[in-house]
């Protein structure tokens, strides 16, 4: 029978082990490309359950081989303060809280850093445990990665359509070109899908999508180039 002291010791070593593995994982991904994420595997499982053929359309490309407008577009669309915050946009969080209090439609306050932490290290569940781990990994990547690296991993790992992950894959499948050849308008259209890339498509954009694309193109004028 385990004593309280034994249980405490086991929990202590589990915590130390988790800390060591998580820090090591973040350090490894500081240099190593992210080829597979938990979400990719989950989507494959969902395809099998639904009787569909599982597939992962993904091709890693370094940031310098992407259109210079792609980081600008997602900053304008997803995280206007990406270059200045340290992982959490507290102004956006306060605004979202006020909107919820007034009964307005909930706006997203998740930063690119938070989304990257979730995409690479966690599952898309909405539990408090996952949210806590997301905050933890966000702090780690902000401490151990550069902003350029966070953006590079984000643009290579994020879901951009059914079975499509990363900017190179969506460029090839939806625009018939490489990520480096995407135009300013292409990048704005891709960014417009990111709140829900399974609902909004850059291949067959709706009227709403075209309107959102124009808004993002306008906002891009106020975002500096990342490289």
How does the language model describe each region?
Residues 2-227:
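Juxtamembrane regions of bacterial inner-membrane/periplasmic proteins
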């Amino acid at each position: 029978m385990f004593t309280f002291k034994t249980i405490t010791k086991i929990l202590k070593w589990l915590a130390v082990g988790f800390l060591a593995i998580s820090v090591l994982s973040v350090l490894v991904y500081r240099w190593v490309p992210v080829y597979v994420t938990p979400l990719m595997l989950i989507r494959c499982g969902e395809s099998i359950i639904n009787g569909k053929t599982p597939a992962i359309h993904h091709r890693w490309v370094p940031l310098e081989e992407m259109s210079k407008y792609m980081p600008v577009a997602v900053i304008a669309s997803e995280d206007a303060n990406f270059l200045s915050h340290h992982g959490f946009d507290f102004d956006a969080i306060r605004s979202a809280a006020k909107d919820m209090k007034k009964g307005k439609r909930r706006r997203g306050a998740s930063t690119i850093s938070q989304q990257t932490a979730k995409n690479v290290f966690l599952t898309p569940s909405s539990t408090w445990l996952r949210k806590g781990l997301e905050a933890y990994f966000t702090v780690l990547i902000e401490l151990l990665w550069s902003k350029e690296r966070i953006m590079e991993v984000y643009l290579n790992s994020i879901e951009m359509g059914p079975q499509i992950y990363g900017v190179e894959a969506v460029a090839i499948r939806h625009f018939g070109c490489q990520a480096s050849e995407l135009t300013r308008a292409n990048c704005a259209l891709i960014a417009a899908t990111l709140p829900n890339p399974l609902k909004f498509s850059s291949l067959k954009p709706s009227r709403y999508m075209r309107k959102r694309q124009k808004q993002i193109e306008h906002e891009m004028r106020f975002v500096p180039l990342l490289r």
